[in-house]
């Protein structure tokens, strides 16, 4: 492994993981550091709708300290309140998130990207996680916080309401996005004005 590959590996650019693995890792980050066995279903039902088997949560191992998990939840909430994840805000819910914009490893097109955003709510008592990954979006900007975060917010809000999770007071947010956001280039322009 050369120096470029080593540097790329340090921030995950050369890693291939499934979306389920990514969601499972984020769950461990926010749930106190416990890596849980992922399941697609929680109950197996019989022909009359009765529960035949219930899959109880299984902790595979502790991967983070509780204190580290708490710090990560605070940082993820700051991403949504003040950073690139502002598009994931949901009125009355504390949301944490992390954007991701990655180059596609196996694409002949050097500009091919995956724009992703993972959001967790309520971040102070994590119950739901939503991961949205857009493969080769054809819009500008291609950042996960711009494209995928609003989808996460919509899915999470509808699910929070459906599950009966009540709205609550949320920390103050900036008066306007203009106070905290950078000026984005117009379509076709670059950041350096070229």
Regions found by a protein language model. Give the residues of each.
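Short, highly charged C-terminal tails/helix-capping segments
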Residues: 166-194
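Active-site beta-strand/loop architecture of penicillin-binding DD-peptidases
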Residues: 1-59, 67, 76-166
């Amino acid at each position: 492994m050369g120096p470029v590959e080593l540097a790329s590996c340090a921030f995950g650019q050369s890693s291939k993981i499934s979306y389920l693995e990514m969601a499972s890792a984020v769950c461990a980050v926010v749930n106190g550091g416990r890596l849980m066995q992922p399941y697609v279903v929680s109950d197996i039902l019989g022909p009359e709708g009765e529960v035949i088997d219930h899959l109880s949560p299984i902790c595979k191992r502790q991967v983070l300290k509780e204190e580290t998990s708490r710090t990560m939840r605070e940082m993820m909430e700051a991403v949504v309140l003040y950073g690139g994840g502002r598009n994931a805000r949901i009125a009355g819910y504390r949301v944490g998130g992390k954007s991701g914009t990655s180059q596609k490893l196996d694409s002949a097109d050097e500009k091919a990207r995956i724009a992703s955003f993972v959001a967790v709510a309520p971040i102070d008592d994590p119950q739901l996680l939503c991961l949205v990954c857009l493969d080769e979006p054809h819009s500008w900007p291609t950042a996960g916080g711009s494209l995928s975060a609003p989808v996460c917010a919509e899915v999470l809000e509808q699910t929070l309401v459906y599950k009966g999770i009540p709205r609550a007071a949320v920390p103050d947010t900036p008066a306007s996005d203009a106070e905290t956001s950078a000026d984005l280039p117009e379509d076709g322009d670059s950041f350096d004005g070229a």
